[in-house]
């Protein structure tokens, strides 16, 4: 599925309509994870690091339970905490269908969507940083609310 990032961002809603998205920066590695409040006490974690302490603290502070953990790519640059969230909390892991992952996950292809219960996560194939890299567009109905690019767009 083809997207123009400018179209997605230019059509983004006003900030008051945005789901609550918490950014969790690992300054040592320069990686960012995100915690998305799904609005009902459940949350989506994106690119969680293996050290879950900051994610756990953010989830506890906002009274959230992580039920989905999405990975943008196979992480040679840091160890992912997604499978740990699956084992420990029963979170459903979402990632690209490509890459030969050897753990249970919901593998998405370009344009495929996952119902998060009120919000939708759409896979967006963005190879480059890694061949199987998957970005995600967070939708509320048909309206894009956020784009998570992982290692395909480094900011800073």
What are these regions (language model features)?
Residues 76, 132, 154:
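Short active-site segment of divalent metal-dependent hydrolases/proteases
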């Amino acid at each position: 599925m083809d997207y123009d990032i400018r179209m997605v961002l230019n059509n983004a809603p006003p900030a008051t309509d945005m789901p609550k998205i918490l950014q969790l920066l690992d300054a040592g590695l320069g990686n960012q994870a995100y915690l998305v409040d799904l609005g009902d006490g459940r949350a989506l974690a994106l690119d969680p690091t293996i050290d879950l302490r900051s994610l756990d603290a953010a989830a506890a502070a906002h009274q959230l339970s992580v039920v989905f953990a999405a990975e943008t790519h196979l992480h040679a640059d840091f160890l992912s905490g997604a499978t740990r969230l699956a084992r420990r909390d029963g979170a459903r892991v979402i990632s690209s269908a490509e890459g030969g992952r050897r753990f249970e996950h919901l593998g998405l292809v370009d344009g495929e969507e996952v119902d998060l219960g009120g919000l939708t996560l759409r896979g967006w194939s963005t190879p480059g940083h890694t061949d199987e890299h998957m970005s995600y567009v967070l939708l509320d109905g048909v309206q894009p609310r956020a784009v998570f690019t992982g290692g395909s767009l480094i900011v800073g």
